Swiss-Prot record:
PROSITE patterns, alphabetized: RHODANESE_3, THUMP
Organism: Pseudomonas fluorescens (strain Pf0-1)
Gene expressing this chain: thiI
GO (cellular component) term, any one: cytosol
SUPFAM superfamilies in alphabetical order: Adenine nucleotide alpha hydrolases-like, Rhodanese/Cell cycle control phosphatase, THUMP domain-like
Catalyzed reaction equations: [ThiI sulfur-carrier protein]-S-sulfanyl-L-cysteine + a uridine in tRNA + 2 reduced [2Fe-2S]-[ferredoxin] + ATP + H(+) = [ThiI sulfur-carrier protein]-L-cysteine + a 4-thiouridine in tRNA + 2 oxidized [2Fe-2S]-[ferredoxin] + AMP + diphosphate; [ThiS sulfur-carrier protein]-C-terminal Gly-Gly-AMP + S-sulfanyl-L-cysteinyl-[cysteine desulfurase] + AH2 = [ThiS sulfur-carrier protein]-C-terminal-Gly-aminoethanethioate + L-cysteinyl-[cysteine desulfurase] + A + AMP + 2 H(+)
Identification of the protein by name: tRNA sulfurtransferase
Length: 484
């Protein structure tokens, strides 16, 4: 299979050195992301696009390649093509006929040709000749350039002919690794996950920072969605997941800060901590999912007071986004269900929160705060490579595993819905239910407590994590299914 990868249009207007740098980075990213599917994949760069060739023929692997490319920053779209040496107009017609002939019978169609290089003919010359001959020889109903039922697309490049089968849109942006790095503050909800996606989509490499206010289930949920975002949109780069224990910080705020200023002070402490971590990682920008006035701490006066504690640039890609638009985007990118099932820990509830906090008053409230508590939280922060975060969580858990399901037991497939649909788990004589891993904590309590449940995933890591959490919650009827 051969693909022509069209780069993000804004790359093409850069200076020659910058353009070359970006296209080389994109080629490197493509090789990295596709390496496990085809170690020998060939990616060659030219001035405004990349040419990708693979000898892989497995339809499932080819589909996965396409899905990964559609989610890779830097790609405007890509074309699946067949390449031939350029012949005369009759030869071009014959090649088009091989691929489109059967589909044109009784249809209204058009021919579109793009051309690059020096030729004695124009693109329109090709379109007129090929279109006229295909109409006569393929039994087409007619030609309509504005509303064709079928569009025959070809490209002529110097002495090569490309017959285009399909076009797949990408997400645009710049290739990861070509621009600077950021640190996104993650809660795992709609806002922070969409903000992380927007930053990745633009081409900024994103590390993840989570402030744990006391919920183990919440930490697990945020790790899962951060790993999902990285795997789908940013896996060409190695980034970190940072978990900061903030329970003691929260306790200090609850005990020493006036109720009306708790939310703003908590955000300032988080920004201080994130700035310290960013400094360690040589990162100059922080990212949050805040939107103007969505909650009391997100009014313009409060955001201004919050930002006073850091010299870092604070990026808020959702600052003027409406909540429903954010939710719709989360559903489109695959994080919506994660957010809906995200365990919450709400330890700061202001009865009458200030919507226009004054900097002087906030600083006065913070005078009683013991900053040693914040320093301890930073000292105990865990920095884990995002590609190992799930494995590391599950490696020391002692959970009973079974290699065979028995009659009466129910196997719960907790893989992502896409994986469960592509490769359904079927066991003779055994009931199999699907329940995505991000919904397990919320939905397991709805199941019949008298039955025995076996959690299943591909590697056994996610199933061990969720089985461990369910057991700690008092559900004794859960095991892990690891078929031999």
């Amino acid at each position: 299979m051969k693909l022509i990868v069209k780069v993000f249009p804004e790359i093409t207007i850069k200076s020659r050195p910058v353009r070359t740098k970006f296209i080389r980075q994109l080629a490197k990213n493509i090789r990295t992301v596709l390496r496990d599917l085809d170690p020998a994949v060939v990616v060659n760069g030219v001035w405004d696009n990349l040419e990708l060739e693979t000898r892989v023929t497995d339809p499932k692997a080819l589909k996965e390649m396409g899905e990964r490319l559609t989610c890779m920053p830097g790609i405007a779209h890509f074309l699946q093509i067949d390449e031939y040496p350029l012949g005369d107009f009759d030869d071009i017609t014959e090649k088009c006929k091989q691929h489109y002939g059967d589909a044109l019978a009784g249809k209204i169609f058009s021919v579109r040709c793009k051309r690059a290089g020096k030729h004695a003919f124009s693109s329109m010359d090709v379109e007129k000749y090929v279109g006229s001959k295909l109409r006569r020889e393929c039994g087409a109903a007619g030609i309509d350039l504005k509303q064709p039922e079928i569009e025959v697309r070809i490209e002529v490049r110097d002495k090569r002919l490309f017959v285009i089968h399909s076009q797949h849109n990408g997400i645009g942006g710049y290739p990861l690794g070509a621009l600077e790095q950021t640190l996104v503050l993650m809660s795992g909800g709609f806002d922070s996950t969409v903000a992380a996606y927007q930053i990745l989509r633009r081409g900024l490499m994103t590390h993840f920072c989570f402030f744990n206010l006391g919920g183990r289930a919440h930490e697990l949920g945020v790790m899962e969605v951060a790993h999902f975002i990285w795997k789908k949109y940013g896996s060409s780069q190695r980034v970190l997941f940072v978990s900061v224990p903030f329970e003691e910080v929260l306790g200090e705020i609850l005990g020493k800060v006036d109720d009306s200023h708790m939310g703003v002070v908590l955000k300032r402490m988080m920004l201080r901590a994130a700035s310290s971590i960013a400094e360690r990682l040589h990162i100059d920008a922080l990212v949050t999912g805040e939107a103007i006035s969505q909650v009391s701490s997100q009014t313009l006066p409060n955001l201004s007071v919050i930002d006073c504690v850091t010299d870092k640039l604070v990026l808020r890609p959702l600052i003027v986004a409406h909540k429903q638009d954010i939710i719709d985007t989360a559903d489109q990118i695959g994080t919506g269900d994660f957010a809906r099932h995200m365990p919450e820990y709400c330890g700061v509830i202001s009865v009458n929160p200030k919507t226009a906090a004054k900097r002087g008053r906030v600083e006065h409230e913070e005078q009683e705060f013991d900053m040693a508590v914040l320093e301890r939280a930073l000292a105990n922060a865990r920095l884990v490579p995002i590609d190992r975060v799930i494995d590391e969580l599950g490696q020391d858990l002692q959970i009973e595993e079974v290699s065979e399901a028995l009659a009466g037991q129910i196997v719960i497939d907790i893989r992502h819905p896409d994986a469960a649909e592509d490769d359904p788990l079927e066991l003779a004589g055994i009931e199999v239910q699907t329940m995505p891993f991000y919904a397990v904590n919320a939905r397991f309590k709805e199941l019949d407590p008298t039955r025995q449940y076996l959690l299943y995933c591909d590697k056994g890591v996610m199933s061990r994590l969720h089985a461990h959490h369910l057991l700690s919650e008092g559900h004794a009827n859960v095991r892990v299914y690891r078929p031999s």
